[in-house]
C-alpha cells in the first residue's frame, strides 16, 4: 500500500483530490487506489473498510479522498459513514441529511432515502445519521448485510468509514462482512504496538487486511513497511 508524503492539515471541507487533482498528495491517493486494484486481480474487492488504530490518525480524510479518486476513474462509489459514535464524514462533503445509516438499519427509512449524490462526480454518500444508543447491535444486524447486497447491485465500489479498531468493536463486526480493510496510521504518532494489536484484532475477526496507509509522512525519514 502506498505511503503518503507529508502534507499540511486542511479544513475538513477541503478534499485535496478534488481541489488539487494534479498535486503530489492526490497522486499518492491514486497510487493507493492502484494498489487496492492490484490486490483484487484474483479476488474482486468491491467493499472496503477504512479504519485506524487510534482516533486522529486520518482515516476519514483518507477514505473521503479515496472515494474521490475512485469516482474520477469512472467508478460509481458509495461512501458509508459507519462511525456511528463520532460521525464526521458528511462534513467533508458539506452534506446535511436527516436520514442516514442508523435510520436505515433501525427501519425508519428506505435505502434510497439515505443515499445522497455529492457534488463530486460518481460519488454518493450515506451519512451515519443520528447517533444511536446501540451502534454495535445495528452494525451486526441483518439489515447491514441486506444493505451491502443491495449496494453491490447499484455501485461499483463501497467504502465504509468505521471507528478506530482499538476504541470499540464496530470495525471488527464489519470486518468479515466486507472484501477488505485498509488501516490508516499517522507517522510519528501511532505506536507500533498499537498497529500490531489492531492487525491482530482484525485478523481474529476474519478480516482481510489489504494494506496500511502511512499518513503525514515526513520527507527524509525511513518509511514504514506495510502488512
Task: State where each predicted segment sits.
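P-loop NTP-binding module
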Residues: 1-227
